[in-house]
């Protein structure tokens, strides 16, 4: 499940290919609130045990010397492969490992699966588990203590009495996108065991034998062998391999398909699977019938689970897996399950929305209907709805006063990047084991060291700036970094930010040199590459601020044009983003502010540089720039569902005479659903009193307004009128008074005349590539021109001044990006010949 919200990215691609539009209004309703991370970093004095034990007392003054080895006394012969981190010696320190209910009760071990006690004293080391899994977990704690910085090959006298808070803890592989490789799955299973997670739900969305239409068919030989290997790896790590099947989209509620389902489960049983889940998520039609689902599950529990004898209770995912669209009434599916579903069957729940925090409120709501503690499916750190992000931030948003009476289990739906998901899973394991003592920030700090001990400083720098999705389930990012606007900062703030950009620039090379986890580096590398570039352009921006403040026009403009991101740079960054909350916005805002200030200094005018405004929080971020980038293939998106009264607009920077507005709504103008389907175009001087420019505009992707009687306005907007649509809202283009040849007071000739208008739009942030010759008329009273250019290395531009008859009066070879041209007498035309990027041609009167 990454749930329908996460299908959004895939559906966008479908729309682009002309597929019939689907209404996603109920699928994307995550709040855009961003909360700080609870907890604080602790000093563990060289000893870290994770998950955090319930009781751990260490006497560092008294120790057992393990350097000569240990004598392993494995009472039940189950742990030969689990003690290899120790040196065996028949005359060494005694290590006794045993488990069983009576033995555990005598040792004071809590009677729950996975509980254990660990003691180290003059008699040796004793591990007692409530069950085999508990003894295995005791060995994991022993391994962490022995390998700790504090122990240094010795074992301090220790008393540990520990147990898990939740019976089911782990991972569900339920995301869309590229499935994990077999190698990554095996690596993750080892990670689950080391971190005391006991559940791995196998349900890849792109596994054709898990879902429609091939769920009835057996796995081919190679795939079956791989699953068998995963089962064996899970057994070694005391993890339940839960194979999930997703039959709901085309299941027939008849005996034939019931037997097809049982046959498939039998085939999986023969591969070693002893735990099963039935998913009915993200389906429609008859397969979503909760009565039929309940009947099927109850029959399977009776005729398959109980008959087999060694199969764990079933887990099911309902179609109504979130409060967002679940029917709350007694006739709803959840209430039906509560009244009819076998009590042994656990029921998944994702919370109030698809990607949401774990709270008592959401559990109380669902538990009162399903009449059992819910099994929480947490859609974090999954990113298949934001695949340009690799989530490396802390694991938080989890209420810490819950118990197993509130939820029966907790599983994370990770990213398609399995190794990179481990940082979040480190937190998932810690939380599910010891809820009350979960410290998200400290857990994250520990996880960084656990994953990359030899490169954790560089990894920390990257991870801190790679946390937020930009949309949907928002996460805090860059919380230690303070940015500023170019006209409001102190020397200390400047120096601190410059130092951070230096760390960002260097982090990728440090990771490459020191990180020994090849699988992790393979996943992170595309993001690290872009991260290093971000650090470099951030440092250049800091230097530019100095040049800007010093008033060095030539040095500033040269630095500015060389620090702008090319289309290729933007495309690469958009695919692998980081620093989206602080670092990249600082770069973009600073570059824009300096360009605008520079233009005003040269002209005395406020540039025609517009900014997004409106009811959506994302309009106040750099995301809104997509409306003003002169590119109809990019778009701003609200990130929130629309409501009546919502609006999207432009701040024109100053009061202007407005005679034309052109807006392209939606992500396309054909069949997109993300637009105001009933709207009105309005203007204002003060953003308080608004006046209409149009009447109701219904189902219009393209809005064109033009008049011969301009209005005076500082703000222009489209406002949503009453309609049932609750989708996000998207805008590709928001043009006010677009520069056209007809609007200019002088003639222009160019190979691409429309593109050439960007050289006269009074916006220094726009540009066009001149290839060949551009000729423009000289206005009366103009004494010269300032040219804001970008020249390719080793290239120059020829500027010719012509009289009215076309005779050349003067020729200038331009080899600098910032250039002033003084007009000679009788100059009637200016001609630029050559290849250059032209930002603005500014007349001087």
Which residue ranges define each predicted feature?
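Acidic, contiguous N-terminal accessory segments
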Residues: 2, 22-122, 151-160
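Sec-dependent N-terminal signal peptides
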Residues: 5-13
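C-terminal segment of classical bacterial N-terminal signal peptides
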Residues: 14-20
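Substrate-binding groove of N-acetylhexosamine-processing glycoside hydrolases
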Residues: 49-51, 299-327, 333-611, 713, ...
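Feature activates predominantly on carbohydrate-active enzymes
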Residues: 71-73, 77-78, 110-264, 270-274
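Active-site groove signature of glycoside hydrolases
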Residues: 264-290, 312-321
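Disordered, acidic Ser/Thr/Pro-rich linker "stalks" and the adjacent N-terminal cap
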Residues: 599-658, 664-678, 687, 696-699, ...
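Short beta-strand-plus-loop segments that form exposed binding edges in beta-rich domains
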Residues: 718-726, 831-837
